[in-house]
């Protein structure tokens, strides 16, 4: 009986750790915790969604509500610089990676703090993401050059360094406190 109980507890623990890797939102907002918002736009200025970053116990919870985007699976990341200059949003820099890890949740030396689950956009042009990144801080996110939420043209393979082969940048928004 004791072995069965231990096996069940082990399976439950593995199941909960899998929640973190699949993008399930597990953070509880802190009383008085900081919040930042990024309004996402395409290169032609079309509004395609809103990302939020909310301080939670032990990390930051990131959410995205996307609209008017091309159907399919798209890589999504937090990038190091709070700039979204068209046409390619290259000014957003690379992935937010204050801990110096490799890219991807499937990489044994990863992930970056800016690595998020893929964004799945339905035929109605809508999709959502919700994930808590343990150890991430609002001070790091909202540093002197801020940060940006970027959506890519292709899916992230969750492994290839530095960007998961996720293609060009199709939407970008700069995080602002408040």
Annotate each predicted stretch with a short phrase.
Residues 15-18:
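C-terminal motif of bacterial Sec signal peptides marking the signal peptidase cleavage site
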């Amino acid at each position: 009986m004791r072995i069965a109980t231990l096996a069940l507890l082990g399976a439950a623990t593995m199941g909960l750790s899998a929640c973190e890797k699949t993008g399930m939102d597990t953070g509880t907002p802190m009383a008085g915790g900081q919040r930042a918002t990024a309004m996402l736009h395409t290169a032609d200025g079309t509004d395609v969604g809103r990302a939020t970053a909310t301080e939670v116990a032990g990390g930051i919870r990131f959410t995205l509500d996307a609209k008017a985007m091309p159907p399919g699976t798209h890589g999504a990341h937090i990038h190091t610089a709070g700039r979204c200059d068209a046409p390619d949003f290259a000014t957003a820099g690379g992935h937010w990676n204050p801990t110096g890890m490799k890219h991807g949740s499937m990489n044994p030396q990863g992930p970056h703090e800016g690595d998020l689950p893929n964004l799945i956009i339905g035929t109605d042009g809508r999709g959502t993401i919700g994930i808590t990144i343990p150890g991430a801080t609002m001070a790091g996110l909202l540093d002197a050059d801020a940060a940006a939420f970027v959506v890519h043209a292709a899916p992230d393979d969750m492994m290839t360094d530095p960007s998961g082969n996720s293609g060009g940048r199709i939407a970008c928004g700069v995080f602002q406190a408040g």
